[in-house]
Amino acid sequence: MLSCWVLLLALLGGACALPAPLGYSQALAQAVDSYNQRPEVQNAFRLLSADPEPGPNVQLSSLHNLNFTIMETRCQARSGAQLDSCEFKEDGLVKDCAAPVVLQGGRAVLDVTCVDSMADPVRVKRVWPLVIRTVIAGYNLYRAIKKK
């Protein structure tokens, strides 16, 4: 009888010792940290955006992939600094990342893959304002010549 109680207590104690399931925001932070641990990463990267954005209605268990964008900061990758306190680097690299979500025993195993972002908002050149100014200048020149 005593062995049954010991077995029951061991089972209940083991169930209580299981780690809490990983949340979506925690999984994103873990994925960014995983990328920052790579040897080729000099400056740490910080989360720029995620799809979907973190919120109370987003469950990690319902996702097949983590899709997010990171940007280079001014902090060294392995300096131990809090990423939230690191400023984004001006003209820093922007990377689009994906990580398949594989849940093993309530824990997420993430294999992060990142590529350089094609849409770098810093380097976008706007052509239309230049075209409009050129047309207006040409029209004004035409009117000035026509008056003479």
Swiss-Prot record:
Record's keyword terms, sorted: Antibiotic, Antimicrobial, Disulfide bond, Immunity, Innate immunity, Secreted, Signal
Subcellular location: Secreted
Keyword check for Secreted: yes
Disulphides: 75-86, 97-114
Gene3D superfamilies xrefs: 3.10.450.10
Extent of the signal sequence: 1-17
One Gene Ontology molecular-function label: lipopolysaccharide binding
Tissue spec: Detected in gizzard, liver, small intestine, large intestine, cloaca, bursa of Fabricius, gall bladder, lung, trachea, kidney, testis and bone marrow.
Task of the protein: Binds bacterial lipopolysaccharide (LPS). Has potent antimicrobial activity against Gram-positive and Gram-negative bacteria (in vitro). Has hemolytic activity (in vitro). May play a role in the innate immune response.
Name assigned to this protein: Cathelicidin-1
Primary gene name: CATHL1
